[in-house]
């Protein structure tokens, strides 16, 4: 159980924290008392593939003097990213084929993805959209208005998923606009927000954002992205609790990552800590086979073994659903655990 004595004077200047993010690998390693090592970042090619970006609030949860820290391994550029495998491609889910208009992706029957923002507060090395052509999908007013018009015309839709990038990179007044606009479309019942920003910068959960999300007729769901229990600290607990008190549904999805969270003990710690802060474990994803991420991949067979062991360690409602996603399918695919 996390310590309940949490400071009440948390600042809300998340934009300052965003601006002060670390983008230089040398600075990051110095902060963590680690020596520069060419295999991590010296290869300019790796940096060009996908630059480093990590807020200091997230770095503060990393263990110093530990090159294998599970939070560090998620964000530090590594020459392993140059390893080629023909099964790992730039668009593993073929999302570009499902683009309706710039920034609007329809993969499912009753719900639609709106890419509200094209950037993130943190660059996770395993990101399945690390090669997504965001420059072709600017989140400007023109594209947003086209997206809204499409959603209005599609009466079979009842849920909008805000994605990105990270949708909470939008400022509060922008969130207010999209919430108000969608709430005026009678057939839209739910608004789901997929985000990692409050995890890495908890102060993003401003009082104003809470007010916006609690004064709409839409049912609000927030799906966080947390992969390891070490990511959860007192500041995150305090800010997540503000959302919980408003009755907002809080779910979490994780990615199974080799060398980071690929064992049942680590996953059990994560599930327990998530529930301690009122977030329900929802999905455990097999890594999408995006180029430059082969070193993170855990096979479906090994993942099944891990989850079967996890079932014996924690209550069933704390066990996330093991899933993968295939291009062309209109839903996630549940992985068979082969239990006898």
Swiss-Prot record:
<keyword id="KW-0004">4Fe-4S</keyword>
<feature type="binding site">
    <location>
        <position position="124"/>
    </location>
    <ligand>
        <name>[4Fe-4S] cluster</name>
    </ligand>
</feature>
<keyword id="KW-0408">Iron</keyword>
<keyword id="KW-0479">Metal-binding</keyword>
<protein>
    <recommendedName>
        <fullName>L-lysine 2,3-aminomutase</fullName>
        <ecNumber>5.4.3.-</ecNumber>
    </recommendedName>
</protein>
<dbReference type="Pfam" id="PF13353">
    <property type="entry name" value="Fer4_12"/>
</dbReference>
<dbReference type="GO" id="GO:0051539">
    <property type="term" value="F:4 iron, 4 sulfur cluster binding"/>
</dbReference>
<feature type="binding site">
    <location>
        <position position="127"/>
    </location>
    <ligand>
        <name>[4Fe-4S] cluster</name>
    </ligand>
</feature>
<dbReference type="GO" id="GO:0016853">
    <property type="term" value="F:isomerase activity"/>
</dbReference>
<feature type="domain" description="Radical SAM core">
    <location>
        <begin position="106"/>
        <end position="321"/>
    </location>
</feature>
<dbReference type="GO" id="GO:0046872">
    <property type="term" value="F:metal ion binding"/>
</dbReference>
<keyword id="KW-0413">Isomerase</keyword>
<keyword id="KW-0663">Pyridoxal phosphate</keyword>
<keyword id="KW-0949">S-adenosyl-L-methionine</keyword>
<dbReference type="InterPro" id="IPR007197">
    <property type="entry name" value="rSAM"/>
</dbReference>
<dbReference type="InterPro" id="IPR003739">
    <property type="entry name" value="Lys_aminomutase/Glu_NH3_mut"/>
</dbReference>
<comment type="similarity">
    <text>Belongs to the radical SAM superfamily. KamA family.</text>
</comment>
<keyword id="KW-0411">Iron-sulfur</keyword>
<feature type="modified residue" description="N6-(pyridoxal phosphate)lysine">
    <location>
        <position position="332"/>
    </location>
</feature>
<feature type="binding site">
    <location>
        <position position="120"/>
    </location>
    <ligand>
        <name>[4Fe-4S] cluster</name>
    </ligand>
</feature>
<dbReference type="InterPro" id="IPR022462">
    <property type="entry name" value="EpmB"/>
</dbReference>
<comment type="function">
    <text>With EpmA is involved in the beta-lysylation step of the post-translational modification of translation elongation factor P (EF-P) on 'Lys-34'. EpmB appears to act before EpmA. Displays lysine 2,3-aminomutase activity, producing (R)-beta-lysine from (S)-alpha-lysine (L-lysine).</text>
</comment>
<dbReference type="InterPro" id="IPR013785">
    <property type="entry name" value="Aldolase_TIM"/>
</dbReference>
